């Protein structure tokens, strides 16, 4: 998992509340168990006018030329609600997104995102709306998300503070998932195992 310290990137927005995981990655694309290859199906029902995904929806924000290459997504409250599919953060990350900014997230989606190196940032409704307004007003608008300083800097230079659990921050800063955490403690685990008694049948 790639570490997340500070990221500056082009921002795109989906001005909708309650964006659920079935919209993020529809159920027909969940057959894979590896994390790659989901980006093309991200927001499939909104991005495409046909089932095959051959006809892009020209009115959907992620299809607009001005947002090509966006790496920060801004949305409204309760982002990631619905089923607990881990494929949702996989699809967002595979598309190239590094951070999602919203007033609130579904709890399971929030945890799944952190576990997969995608930073979910909670800001107030007012702060999120300001970011959306600034991004809409200026093509190429970039936002900086600094996990070390726990700040978000808007295109105009306004700085907003956010909070995240210390353990989640540590894992993201160091690029540690569950396996990485276990490997980081390999010596302690080995010492503990060496102390275990050997039982004979």
Swiss-Prot record:
MF terms in GO: 3-isopropylmalate dehydratase activity
Annotated CDD domains: IPMI_Swivel
Positions of disulphide bridges: none
Membrane-spanning residues: none
Reactions listed under catalytic activity: (2R,3S)-3-isopropylmalate = (2S)-2-isopropylmalate
Pathway annotation: Amino-acid biosynthesis; L-leucine biosynthesis; L-leucine from 3-methyl-2-oxobutanoate: step 2/4
Keyword Amino-acid biosynthesis: yes
SUPFAM superfamilies: LeuD/IlvD-like
One annotated Gene Ontology cellular component of this protein: 3-isopropylmalate dehydratase complex
Key words of the record: Amino-acid biosynthesis, Branched-chain amino acid biosynthesis, Leucine biosynthesis, Lyase
GO biological process assignments: L-leucine biosynthetic process
Keyword check for Amino-acid biosynthesis: yes
EC assignment: 4.2.1.33
NCBIfam families xref list: leuD, PRK01641.1
PANTHER family: 3-ISOPROPYLMALATE DEHYDRATASE SMALL SUBUNIT (PTHR43345:SF5), 3-ISOPROPYLMALATE DEHYDRATASE SMALL SUBUNIT 2-RELATED-RELATED (PTHR43345)
Family: Belongs to the LeuD family. LeuD type 1 subfamily.
HAMAP family, alphabetized: LeuD_type1
Subunit structure of this chain's protein: Heterodimer of LeuC and LeuD.
Function: Catalyzes the isomerization between 2-isopropylmalate and 3-isopropylmalate, via the formation of 2-isopropylmaleate.
Name of the featured protein: 3-isopropylmalate dehydratase small subunit
